[in-house]
Amino acid sequence: MVVTQSLHDLLNLDMRGYPVAAVQDSVLAHIEWKYPIDLHTTPYFNSGMLLADLVQWREHNIAVQLLKTAACLNEAVPYGNQCFLNTVFQKNWLQLEESWNFQTGAVEYFQKRNLSEVFPKPDTVPPVIHYTTRAKPWLCDYGEIPFIEVYWQYYCADWPKA
């Protein structure tokens, strides 16, 4: 994941009483999938970038709820913690613009199916780039990865010593 812009607006966001804010999963929003958990009928977020209202988490013992959910669902979920989070926060999360968690794997997914118009690569660099799926910039055996040049720009940057 690469952050390319200030997170000031995100960190000062009015969460309107929601315990989490996230971006809808770009692929799962467009395909029908059925698993032992009933999440295919409600919006499902990608947990790679999650904004949490920690006051609410403490007041509502969210950590305990997540642990109980994980214990109950155990191996029955395809996306681990993401499914646990979506189960606990089902219909109780604030949806953010997709640029706050631009999921590169979605571009590849829809291109392979000749459906690029469903999820096109944006013309401008998003504030948060999430290199989803197995296609990672540091693994050279994958084809074209959206915004791979941004990853390498930050990787090769001359960072100050701490």
Question: Where in the sequence are the language-model features?
Answer:
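A glycosyltransferase accessory/donor-loop signature
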Residues: 46-162
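GT-A fold catalytic core of metal-dependent nucleotide-sugar glycosyltransferases
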Residues: 1-28, 42, 49-60
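A short secondary-structure junction signal
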Residues: 5-9, 31-35, 60-65, 141
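A short, conserved beta-to-alpha structural element at the edge of catalytic cores
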Residues: 16-40, 139, 143-147
